[in-house]
C-alpha cells in the first residue's frame, strides 16, 4: 500500500539524486550519481546524511547511465563514453582524496551496468560484450 508519510519511510532526499543509474550499497556506504553531472555521492544508508565530499569523476566525458558496482574494496563507475573509473572504497567518513586508482577506456559506448562474477568484470557495449580479467 501507500507508505507516504508513514514510519516505513526512514529518510528521503530530493536533490543530488541520480537520473538513470541505480544506487550501490557497498559495505556500510550508499553510493549514487548526481543527476547528469558525473559526480559520485556517498551517504550513510541508515540516516541519509552525506559522507565526506562529493567526487567529480573527471575521466568520464559523457553521461553515466550504468549503475556503479563494487568488489574487493573498489568501486567501478562506467560512462557512456567507454571510460571506467576505478575508485578506492573509503571506510566511514574517510576522505575521498586520492580515491581514483585507475581510469580505463574501451572504444565502445556503455549504457548497461557492469556485472561482476568471481574475478571477472563484464561490460555490455553497443558493439560488443567484454569480459575483463587478470
Residue ranges of model-derived segments:
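Noncatalytic, solvent-exposed loop/strand surfaces
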Residues: 1-134
Amino acid at each position: 500500500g501507500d507508505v507516504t508519510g508513514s514510519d516505513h519511510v526512514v529518510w528521503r532526499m530530493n536533490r543530488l539524486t541520480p537520473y538513470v543509474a541505480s544506487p550501490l550499497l557497498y559495505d556500510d556506504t550508499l553510493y549514487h550519481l548526481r543527476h547528469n553531472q558525473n559526480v559520485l555521492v556517498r551517504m550513510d544508508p541508515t540516516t541519509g546524511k552525506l559522507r565526506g565530499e562529493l567526487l567529480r569523476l573527471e575521466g568520464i566525458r559523457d553521461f553515466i547511465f550504468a549503475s556503479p558496482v563494487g568488489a574487493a574494496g573498489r568501486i567501478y563507475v562506467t560512462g557512456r563514453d567507454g571510460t571506467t573509473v576505478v575508485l578506492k572504497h573509503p571506510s566511514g567518513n574517510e576522505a575521498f582524496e586520492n580515491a581514483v586508482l585507475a581510469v580505463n577506456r574501451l572504444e565502445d559506448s556503455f549504457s548497461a551496468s557492469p556485472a561482476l562474477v568471481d574475478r571477472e568484470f563484464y561490460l555490455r557495449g553497443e558493439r560488443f560484450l567484454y569480459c575483463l580479467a587478470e
